[in-house]
């Protein structure tokens, strides 16, 4: 049989291989001299082994040689079929199914092909022969030539080698994205400089503190927190804050209660008298450009709170101080208006009304010029002693001992009812320095004859000083005897001057003395 003949031939070759590593060409032809009729059809193609360069064929099988290249000669179709049989093993050959040691060492190509069978068989995927090797006619078609320069397994490798790992294509896109985030963190939102003055910003910080006083460092922190412009602004703004604290009278330095601890430096607080002024200034800028203020703030919704809030220390002293100021002002006004001359050690006594009638007293005296008998002025200020009505009869002498006391306690009456009836009285009463003027002009008790032998009365009936009605029972309630005398001008001299100063009634020669209240 064929197997026995082949075995005998191979055994002879093996025996001679130990003596000669390079057998003669006759030994190569032993495989080809076998009759074609005795061999099966698949073994007839083995005749190409004597004429084909096996190393060249190995390179083509491994994919290192481009079969479609113009410089490579086209191999015999039988050679490709033999390669397919050797690598894939679809139709096993009796010659190659023997042990590996049966292959003659001196036969070029057989040994290397058998040794490389396992290593070359790993290229076909899944242990199946490629379509190009099974179908030789399609190998030379133009459409299938690009599939053979590289094996299927090798075609998957170049993309990885050229472009790196699967994520190698993506880094150019995420890297700019990350750079954008980092740039945003390094360059935050731009905040413009607030339109508020430094004094307003300092006042905001002090008004929104717990105690109403802060050190300079905490004022800095407040401004940077609520107005981020100062986070990146040059350090010159801190000098401006310190200058405002030192020079602006709206701020005052207070004692640091924690001076005994490690904290050093002074505290600054708002001047309570100027808090309202600062708040008004803040509201003015808010009305002027609210949008600009909001753009400069980290939290624009807190603006109203920063302007209006006050600490407890700024509220408490203001409430009791408000009623005190009007009281003091009223007392001062009353003292100046009344021109009080009363000695504080003396007991209080009723005030007396000082009335000087400026209208001329003659036969045609107008009723409006006199106070009505039922006027409240005499009732409100009763005289120190009972006074009789004026009459043509002489008046009694006053008590000499009580005159000085009465004079000391005389003060002007600010009764609005009396002033409304007689404007001349108002003019006289509002002169706060009246007594100083009288003193400069020589007004004294001695010159006026208050305690001298002056007439005790005047003949009013003879001089015609009675009212126009002629009734003897009527009197002049505005002329009362109090122990103080002065001189009154005659009707002729008074008629020429309407309302005049007090010097016109005092100390003139030829004037008739009359009694004053």
UniProtKB/Swiss-Prot annotation:
Query: Which purpose does this protein serve, as stated in its record?
Result: Transcription factor essential for neural and some non-neural tissues development, such as retina and lung respectively. Binds to an 11-bp consensus sequence containing the invariant tetranucleotide 5'-ACGC-3'. During development of the central nervous system, is required to specify the amacrine and horizontal cell fates from multipotent retinal progenitors while suppressing the alternative photoreceptor cell fates through activating DLL4-NOTCH signaling.
Organism for this UniProt entry? Homo sapiens (Human)
For this entry, the protein name equals Forkhead box protein N4
List, alphabetically, the GO terms of the cellular component aspect: chromatin; nucleus
**What Gene3D superfamilies does the database record attribute to this sequence?**
Winged helix-like DNA-binding domain superfamily/Winged helix DNA-binding domain
Please classify the protein's predominant subcellular localization into one broad category.
nucleus
Summarize which parts of the chain are annotated to bind DNA, as ranges. Answer: 193-289
Q: Where does this protein reside within or beyond the cell?
A: Nucleus
Q: Name one GO molecular function term.
A: DNA-binding transcription factor activity, RNA polymerase II-specific
Share an example GO biological-process annotation for this protein.
atrioventricular canal development
Which residues lie within the region annotated Disordered?
Answer: 365-398, 497-517
What residue intervals traverse the membrane? none
Q: Which cysteines are joined by disulfide bonds?
A: none
- Keyword match Nucleus: yes
Q: Which SUPFAM superfamilies match?
A: Winged helix' DNA-binding domain (SSF46785)
The UniProt keywords, alphabetically, are: Developmental protein, DNA-binding, Neurogenesis, Nucleus, Transcription, Transcription regulation
């Amino acid at each position: 049989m064929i197997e026995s003949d082949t075995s005998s031939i191979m055994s002879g070759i093996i025996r001679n291989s130990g003596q000669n590593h390079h057998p003669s060409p006759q030994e190569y032809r032993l495989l080809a001299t076998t009759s074609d009729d005795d061999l099966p059809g698949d073994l007839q193609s083995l005749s190409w082994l004597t004429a084909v360069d096996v190393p060249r064929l190995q390179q083509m099988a491994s994919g290192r040689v481009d079969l479609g290249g113009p410089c490579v000669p086209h191999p015999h179709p039988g050679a490709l079929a033999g390669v397919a049989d050797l690598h894939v093993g679809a139709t096993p050959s009796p010659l190659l199914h023997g042990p590996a040691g049966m292959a003659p060492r001196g036969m070029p190509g057989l040994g290397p092909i058998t040794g490389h069978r396992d290593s070359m068989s790993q290229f076909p995927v899944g242990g199946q022969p490629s379509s190009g090797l099974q179908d030789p006619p399609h190998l030379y078609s133009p459409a299938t030539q690009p599939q053979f320069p590289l094996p299927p397994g090798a075609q998957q490798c170049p993309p990885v080698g050229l472009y790196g790992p699967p994520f190698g294509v993506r880094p150019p896109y995420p890297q700019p994205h990350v750079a954008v985030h980092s740039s945003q963190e390094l360059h935050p939102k731009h905040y413009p400089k607030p339109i508020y003055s430094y004094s307003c910003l300092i006042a905001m910080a002090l008004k929104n503190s717990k105690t109403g006083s802060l050190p300079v460092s905490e004022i800095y922190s407040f401004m940077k927190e609520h107005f981020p412009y100062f986070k990146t602004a040059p350090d010159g703004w801190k000098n401006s804050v310190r200058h405002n604290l030192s020079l602006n009278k709206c701020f005052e330095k207070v004692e640091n209660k924690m001076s005994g601890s490690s904290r050093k430096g002074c505290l600054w607080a708002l001047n309570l008298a100027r808090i309202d002024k600062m708040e008004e200034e803040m509201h003015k800028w808010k009305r002027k450009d609210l949008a600009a203020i909001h753009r400069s703030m980290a939290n624009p919704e807190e603006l109203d709170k920063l302007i209006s809030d006050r600490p407890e220390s700024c509220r408490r002293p203001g409430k009791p101080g408000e009623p005190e100021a009007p009281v003091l002002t009223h007392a001062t006004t009353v003292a100046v208006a009344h021109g009080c001359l009363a000695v504080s050690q003396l007991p209080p006594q009723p005030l007396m009304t000082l009335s000087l009638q400026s209208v001329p007293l003659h036969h045609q005296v107008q009723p409006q010029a006199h106070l009505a008998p039922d006027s409240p002025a005499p009732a409100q200020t009763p005289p120190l002693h009972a006074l009789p009505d004026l009459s043509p009869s002489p008046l009694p002498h006053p008590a000499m001992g009580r005159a000085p006391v009465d004079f000391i306690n005389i003060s002007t009456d600010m009764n609005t009812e009396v002033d409304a009836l007689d404007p001349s009285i108002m003019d006289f009463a509002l002169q706060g320095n009246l007594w100083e003027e009288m003193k400069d002009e020589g007004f004294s008790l001695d010159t006026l004859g208050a305690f001298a032998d002056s007439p005790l009365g005047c003949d009013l009936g003879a001089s015609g000083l009675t009212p126009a009605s002629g009734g003897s029972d009527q009197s002049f309630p505005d002329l009362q005897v109090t122990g103080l005398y002065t001189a009154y001008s005659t009707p002729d001299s008074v008629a020429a001057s309407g309302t005049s100063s007090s010097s016109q009634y005092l100390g003139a020669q030829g004037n008739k003395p009359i009694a004053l209240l």
